[in-house]
């Protein structure tokens, strides 16, 4: 259900390093650890888990077209996300584009102020974002 799926997702995105056999063989996390429901309501329509996760891992950007684009493409990565999936992804895409990601304060959700259980650095994030946008 949603709780079990989201608990696995949270553990996966917070994991530092490769998702090797040892990581994948770990027991499933308890959804209650994250304040998520433990029962399976049978619903599989969650936008993240039911729609995006099945298709996102198979998507590969057209890097040639992106490099040729007239717009500036800026990748960002949170300094506290080092080694995590989102940060590794930002660096991998940036490398293919021949650029370097901008490092934002905090982690993957650095723009949040804790309202969803992920305290970030919204003021620091905003300052860095303003710097990036000023370079346009």
Regions inferred by a protein language model and the residue ranges of each:
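Catalytic active-site module of serine/aspartate enzymes centered on a nucleophile-bearing elbow/loop
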Residues: 88-91, 97-136
């Amino acid at each position: 259900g949603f709780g079990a799926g989201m608990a696995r997702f949270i553990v996966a995105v917070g994991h530092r390093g490769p998702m090797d056999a040892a990581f994948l063989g770990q027991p499933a996390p308890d959804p209650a650890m994250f304040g998520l429901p433990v029962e399976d309501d049978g619903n599989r329509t969650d936008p993240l888990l039911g729609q995006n996760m099945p298709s996102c891992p198979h998507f590969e950007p057209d890097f040639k077209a992106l490099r040729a684009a007239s717009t500036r493409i800026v990748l960002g990565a949170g300094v506290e996300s080092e080694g995590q999936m989102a940060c590794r992804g930002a660096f991998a895409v940036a490398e293919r584009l021949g650029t370097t990601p901008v490092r934002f304060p905090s982690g993957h959700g650095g723009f949040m102020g804790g309202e969803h259980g992920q305290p970030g650095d919204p003021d620091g994030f905003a300052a860095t974002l303003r710097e990036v946008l000023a370079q346009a």
